[in-house]
Design a protein with these regions (language model features):
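N-terminal beta-alpha supersecondary unit
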Residues: 7-91
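Residue-level signature for short turns and capping positions that connect secondary-structure elements
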Residues: 28, 58, 69, 100-102, ...
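Short pre-catalytic strand/loop immediately N-terminal to key active-site residues, enriched for Gly-Thr
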Residues: 93-106
């Protein structure tokens, strides 16, 4: 039995957290709140992380096991997303992340994982928040999270929260990831 089969057999539900490409990025200006207004086209791609989630009743603890040792729990957007969704509920969560999206490659892995956890807890916990409310919640954690909650290729403006769905012709992309990691915050500073 594979690890995936073991997780699914023990009550975990599997979700896919896709990566994205910025087909172009134009930084318009820096805002007073420290964010930047941008224009971009975000394209979802097939590369994805696997997220396994199991909710527990009457236990508010959140446990995350990440296949990447590079992510510190206190910096993990996935943990913050679970906290945000479970804060006023008598639910806890066990989350296992199988990383395939390279960290620091600009592919949105952390934001995608957080968005996936927000949507998964909404579904599994029968919270029934609307997509608009999920997007508002996600924006509190990161500018790319609304895009992943929306789940469609988009023309993006503002800090990333203004989304206009677009059709992009089928294309093939080659993603080359050098042995280099870049923090998004560093790029925009």
């Amino acid at each position: 039995m594979t690890n995936i089969q073991k997780l699914e057999a023990s009550g975990y539900t599997r979700f896919s957290a896709p990566a994205k490409l910025n087909l172009f990025l134009k930084v318009i200006n820096k805002r007073k709140d420290g964010y930047h207004n941008i224009q971009s086209v975000f394209q979802l791609i097939d590369l994805h992380d696997d997220i396994f989630i199991k909710l527990r009743e009457k236990d508010k603890q959140i446990n995350i096991k990440n296949s990447s040792l590079l992510i510190k729990p206190e910096n993990d957007l996935t943990f913050k997303a679970a906290q945000l969704m479970l804060i006023d509920r008598q639910l806890g969560a066990d989350i296992v992340i199988n990383k395939n999206i390279p960290i620091g490659a600009g592919l949105g892995g952390g934001s995608s994982n957080a968005a996936t956890v927000i949507m998964a807890i909404n579904k599994l916990g029968k919270i029934n928040m609307s997509k608009i409310d999920l997007i508002k919640h996600g924006l509190r954690l990161g500018a790319d999270i609304p895009f992943f909650i929306n789940g469609k290729n988009a023309w993006v403006e503002g800090i990333g929260e203004l989304l206009n769905d677009i059709k992009i012709t089928n294309s093939t992309y080659v993603v080359i990831v050098p042995n280099l990691s870049i923090n998004t915050k560093t790029i925009f500073s």
